[in-house]
């Protein structure tokens, strides 16, 4: 391959062939979707001008934001563990951290982290880090998003919004029956967001009477699916792109959407067994309190 022309060769022998069309030999080329590790695939040694995407019948130039997002996504270590310069323990909402630590101890009663001070706890969790080469330290992207104060989050991630809309039982003159968004009444970090929306999402779900031995089981497969969908929306979001973590509760179902494209092809997701978290540290923070699993 001429690396001066194209950045990566993703074609295999099976992607090229020929066929007979009305007596004429036609060469066909199937261009597969590139693995996230190789994106963006670009030409002429210029990713900003040489990256294209196929939208149905045409190829389009990728925007600068799309190119940057692909470079960030190429890392296997995720995008939420980087040190945020200038963001310190002063930017942590202590009430959020206290609530999380109580829940953490409930799920991990014998864990040694329960007895360490807040900064060390956050460092072990991946929410706080120290650059060993420069000795600079501070919150990671995961730490600020999960436990940060509203103002600090807006200063660094003003490109991201969180929005919950309940569109059930609406009247002709209303667009929603309940809404949770930025209004200054709550610290809009990810922990507060998920803890506020989950009860709202499952409040109307039926809980058939079930027993596990002599203990009533209130959790159902639907409850678990809704929780998993909400957590997946958060841990797979691209917080470096502009967009909304949006949750809609409708009469006939739920809608979860987030900024960013899929790291894996849709076919691979449906096949199962393929799992790449965009924000593994945030994922682990939820897993440690019983929300979501590492697959």
PLM feature segments, named:
Residues 2-9, 235-238, 287:
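Short, solvent-exposed secondary-structure boundary motifs
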Residues 15-17, 154, 244-246:
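Short, surface-exposed charged micro-motifs
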């Amino acid at each position: 391959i001429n690396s001066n022309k194209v950045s990566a060769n993703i074609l295999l022998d099976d992607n090229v062939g020929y066929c007979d069309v009305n007596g004429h030999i036609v060469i066909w080329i199937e261009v597969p979707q590139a693995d996230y590790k190789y994106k963006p695939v670009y030409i002429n040694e210029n990713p900003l001008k040489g990256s294209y995407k196929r939208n149905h019948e045409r190829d389009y130039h990728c925007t600068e934001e799309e190119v940057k997002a692909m470079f960030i996504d190429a890392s296997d270590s995720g995008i939420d563990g980087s040190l945020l310069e200038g963001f310190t323990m002063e930017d942590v909402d202590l009430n959020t951290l206290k609530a999380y630590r109580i829940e953490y101890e409930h799920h991990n009663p014998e864990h040694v982290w329960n007895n360490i001070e807040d900064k060390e706890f956050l460092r072990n969790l991946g929410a706080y880090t120290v650059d060993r080469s420069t000795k600079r330290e501070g919150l990671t992207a995961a730490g600020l998003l999960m436990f940060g104060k509203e103002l600090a989050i807006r200063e660094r991630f003003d490109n991201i919004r969180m929005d919950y809309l309940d569109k059930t039982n609406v009247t002709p003159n209303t667009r929603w029956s309940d809404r949770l968004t930025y209004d200054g009444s709550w610290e809009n970090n990810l922990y507060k967001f998920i803890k506020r929306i989950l009860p709202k999402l499952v409040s109307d779900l039926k809980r058939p009477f079930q027993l596990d031995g002599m203990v009533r089981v209130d959790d159902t497969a639907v409850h678990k699916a809704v929780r998993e969908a909400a957590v997946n929306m958060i841990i797979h979001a691209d917080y470096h792109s502009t967009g909304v973590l949006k949750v809609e509760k409708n009469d006939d179902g739920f809608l979860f959407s987030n900024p960013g494209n899929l790291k894996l092809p849709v076919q691979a997701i449906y096949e199962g067994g393929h799992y790449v978290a965009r924000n593994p540290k945030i994922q682990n923070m939820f897993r440690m309190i019983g929300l979501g699993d590492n697959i």
